[in-house]
Amino acid sequence: MSFTVTQYILFLFSFFAVGGAMSLAAYRDDRTASFVGSVFAGLGSLAGLCAGIAAIVAPQATTYSIATMFPFLTLSIHIDKLAGIFLTIISLVAFLATVYGYGYMRHYFGKYNIGAFYFFYNLFLGSMMLVTLANHALFFLVAWELMSLASYFLVVFDHKEH
């Protein structure tokens, strides 16, 4: 079965959205939240890797747009060969960080909200990939701000003094 670049992109954002929501919903059980958040972050990263490689070998660029009720905000993504290269690099690093982070987060079990961490982690990965794909200036800025806010919450996650 062969998928198009657009289908890989839809899988990518679906995995990150579901992973973030499910890990946040499982916030009371650290093991479940960590497992679900990591699995969906890994699947989203693999979908991004497939989308990036498919875009690199595709003969032409792909554009996908969704109309909104705001005339100045078009949800439009565009993936050409350059975006495919960046998406491939980001996805590969994200996948490796997810695999490493799954074991690393065990020592935070019972100390912090692991579900919230994986919510922001999935949001960060999805918005970082969205920055490379945004085809509209305002949409790019929204994705950039989502990425910035998610990274802030990831940085302050370990906020207790040791």
Predicted region positions:
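Membrane-embedded alpha-helical core segments of multi-pass
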Residues: 15-19, 44-47, 90-100, 122-125, ...
